[in-house]
Amino acid sequence: MLGMYVPDRFSLKSSRVQDGMGLYTARRVRKGEKFGPFAGEKRMPEDLDENMDYRLMWEVRGSKGEVLYILDATNPRHSNWLRFVHEAPSQEQKNLAAIQEGENIFYLAVEDIETDTELLIGYLDSDMEAEEEEQQIMTVIKEGEVENSRRQSTAGRKDRLGCKEDYACPQCESSFTSEDILAEHLQTLHQKPTEEKEFKCKNCGKKFPVKQALQRHVLQCTAKSSLKESSRSFQCSVCNSSFSSASSFEQHQETCRGDARFVCKADSCGKRLKSKDALKRHQENVHTGDPKKKLICSVCNKKCSSASSLQEHRKIHEIFDCQECMKKFISANQLKRHMITHSEKRPYNCEICNKSFKRLDQVGAHKVIHSEDKPYKCKLCGKGFAHRNVYKNHKKTHSEERPFQCEECKALFRTPFSLQRHLLIHNSERTFKCHHCDATFKRKDTLNVHVQVVHERHKKYRCELCNKAFVTPSVLRSHKKTHTGEKEKICPYCGQKFASSGTLRVHIRSHTGERPYQCPYCEKGFSKNDGLKMHIRTHTREKPYKCSECSKAFSQKRGLDEHKRTHTGEKPFQCDVCDLAFSLKKMLIRHKMTHNPNRPLAECQFCHKKFTRNDYLKVHMDNIHGVADS
């Protein structure tokens, strides 16, 4: 299942155009930015029928315009965060359009979108295409536009999915497949209710214009009232059920009478009746009608195939926030499982290597690496793998294909996630501000680490071998490998071993030539972000490291450390031949050349005198021959 992870630059809130959650911008989005790809199950067009909900479906076409398949994101287990982008009520309100690249669907910003704006999808019309040609967005659109398969897209669904939308709304541009759906649309969005038609909450008296809004409110209102009225809850003397409000209790009493001993178990009904015949009549009248009408979500009107699937679907309208990192989940179980990642406890150990884990299932998955059975063999290097996903990731290290390109610096990446992570370096907006100082950050987790390290001096994970402390347990585990010499990660190009995936990843760039970190001032690129940061200081002349003795400043910490030795007289680099000591390692290396009988000598072209170092030769030519080095 694809988790409902939402990138930091977006947030989930109640939609302004439909019931349920919508996707909003957490920062300004520029025209031409692209998001995706859209995730969903692949379905063939012939598997669809006109009773299905098309709002979360996209059609994927081949090079000749033929329909290859339908991407269906109806099931949250097979979708991603783009499922929360709703159809724009009209073309004027859209700020995104769908495009197809290869067999992937992406969402393209067709205008600059301000912060805290709901993202609404539409289709590209001819005016939009002409405007794109003028403003270079066509560099993003390589395979042509994708038509919208959602319910309100009148230009898309008529030709592709065989559903005629003959019932047009007189208030907006929407059209629908039946008069009943049109009537529901008018009542929900356009009709102002009369006093007698308002839907009123029996708990608090609050009124709502539509029934769906009331149903959502009741879930929250009942939970609040249960806390306030827990001391005076209402309990049924027949079945011992408790209720937080008198109205709910009275409604229950009508169905739960002492003389009603026949219980209806259909669809979790629970109604009690006096006789077997009454139960039979009830089931025929209530539970054997048109099943399609009973399996419709009251929030988004999605039609489900069974009561259990409807119950599962309703969970997507409940969003559970992690209070530690603000990630969002669609079920309490997912959130509970995620919270383990924030815990310091690792109670489950592997009895073979004593490695500890936070979850028992992780131990089971880990034990496979100790088994000799490694069914996934790499055909290129012969390396075996116990897990299929690890094998698939390994195969990518042999591939030169990088289909995902950054539009800012043209860097290429193998996966959408790698590209998305890289794009953070181009985002100039830092939305997370430290309350202790003026520092700002692009991600909240980076801000949290800053506060812990700088302001709280909070490094609670300490190495028992060297007493060095770290902010997170993962960094401590990586550090410990420097003591044990453990190097599990092997470079597929040269066989060199590394202690962590991060150092291996940086090393592999020396083989592939990948330099994803581009200098904004010049054309120079770097394989590591630290290298880029230090290089940028050559443009900005920034020297943040100052000597406390003489106020001399340096652009790198290493330069400051070397300079301090001129004040302390410390010379930690000693020659093992003649015991001379030096303050810098490069000075020791240069000195050792004098002990090498086979060393290359620098020769004067005028008098053929030889010198052990080039700088000695330069001084000689300047003083003796009057030739300055150019």
UniProtKB/Swiss-Prot annotation:
SUPFAM superfamilies, A to Z:
beta-beta-alpha zinc fingers, SET domain
Quaternary structure note: Interacts with EHMT2/G9A, GFI1 and HDAC1.
**Residues of the SET domain:** 8-124
EC nos:
2.1.1.-
Which tissues is this chain's protein expressed in?
Answer: Widely expressed with highest levels in colon and ovary. Tends to be silenced in breast, colorectal, gastric and liver cancer tissues.
Matches recorded under CDD domains = PR-SET_PRDM5
The beginning of the lineage is:
Eukaryota, Metazoa, Chordata, Craniata, Vertebrata
Homology family: Belongs to the class V-like SAM-binding methyltransferase superfamily.
Q: What does this protein do?
A: Sequence-specific DNA-binding transcription factor. Represses transcription at least in part by recruitment of the histone methyltransferase EHMT2/G9A and histone deacetylases such as HDAC1. Regulates hematopoiesis-associated protein-coding and microRNA (miRNA) genes. May regulate the expression of proteins involved in extracellular matrix development and maintenance, including fibrillar collagens, such as COL4A1 and COL11A1, connective tissue components, such as HAPLN1, and molecules regulating cell migration and adhesion, including EDIL3 and TGFB2.
> Protein name, please?
PR domain zinc finger protein 5
Q: Which GO terms describe its cellular component?
A: nuclear body; nucleolus; nucleoplasm; nucleus
Q: Which residues form the signal peptide?
A: none
Residue spans annotated as Zn fingers (C2H2-type) read 167-190, 199-221, 234-256, 262-287, 295-317, 320-342, 348-370, 376-398, 404-426, 432-455, 461-483, 489-511, 517-539, 545-567, 573-595, 602-625
> According to the UniProt entry, which disease involves this protein?
Brittle cornea syndrome 2: A disorder characterized by extreme corneal thinning resulting in corneal rupture after minor trauma, blue sclerae, keratoconus or keratoglobus, hyperelasticity of the skin, and hypermobile joints.
